[in-house]
């Protein structure tokens, strides 16, 4: 799988933090019921890898990826947990080359023109623009489109259901990352119906963007 394949499954990739393994499978099923198939599980909790394994085994219709990859070891652990892709908050040549060597498709993070050049030089032309809002948002992506007409972006960070259409309307944006689909209070309360509703609203952005 190529990371660019992810865009064919919907306009938003949820950026997910899971605190309890028991929540992983019902959360994935709730998102899938709302039309969201691609899931980014961040490596920000001790149970993240176990959650990836659980979802991959119990909900094979999903495409599980690992977010917050910051080292070669993280990339290998994600692959071993059954992840189909990885996402990093930034880019280093070591991570980029390691992911290619082990066969883990990577969506590397960038925030500046220099970082875009570094990732592009290593063969990555679909990049995570992070943190999207803090790094300049829509105006910055418009500015990057000039010198980097061959690069596509997945803006992530500070995006909401209300602002996502502004990003998705850009010609160099194919998909957005968003944490708003899985608010922590809804997960803690196991309010799967609310999460399904949020997923449906995000999926509908494909039609209105």
What are the residue ranges of the model-derived segments?
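Anionic-ligand binding region
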Residues: 113-127, 137-147
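Short acidic active-site motifs
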Residues: 51, 73-74, 94-95, 114-115, ...
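Hydrophobic, well-structured mid-protein blocks that either form specific transmembrane helices
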Residues: 74, 79-119
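CoA-thioester-processing core
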Residues: 99, 106, 137-148, 155
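Glycine-rich phosphate-binding active-site loops on the catalytic face of alpha/beta enzymes
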Residues: 85, 89-95, 128-138, 172-194
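Glycine-rich beta-to-alpha transition loops that act as phosphate-gripper elements at the mouths
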Residues: 17-21, 66-72, 88-92, 108-113, ...
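Short hydrophobic/aromatic-enriched beta-strand-loop microsegments
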Residues: 62-66, 84-90, 105-109, 125-131, ...
């Amino acid at each position: 799988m190529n990371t660019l394949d992810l865009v064919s499954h919907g306009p938003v990739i949820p950026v997910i933090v899971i605190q309890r393994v028991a929540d992983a499978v019902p959360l994935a099923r709730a998102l899938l019921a709302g039309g969201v198939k691609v899931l980014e599980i961040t490596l920000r909790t001790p149970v993240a890898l176990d959650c990836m394994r659980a979802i991959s085994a119990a909900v094979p219709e999903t495409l599980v990826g690992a977010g917050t990859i910051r080292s070669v070891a993280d990339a290998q652990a994600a692959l071993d947990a059954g992840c189909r892709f990885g996402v990093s908050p930034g880019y280093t040549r070591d991570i980029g080359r390691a992911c290619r060597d082990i066969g883990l498709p990577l969506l590397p993070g960038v925030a500046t023109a220099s970082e875009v050049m570094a990732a592009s030089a290593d063969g990555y032309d679909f990049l995570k623009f992070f943190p999207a809002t803090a790094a300049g948002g829509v105006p910055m992506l418009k500015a990057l489109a000039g010198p980097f007409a061959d690069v596509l972006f997945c803006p992530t960070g500070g995006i909401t259901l209300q602002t996502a259409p502004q990003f998705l309307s850009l010609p160099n944006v194919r998909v957005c990352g968003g944490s708003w689909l899985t608010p922590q209070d809804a997960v803690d309360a196991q309010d799967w119906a609310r999460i399904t509703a949020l997923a449906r609203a995000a999926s509908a952005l494909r039609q209105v963007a």
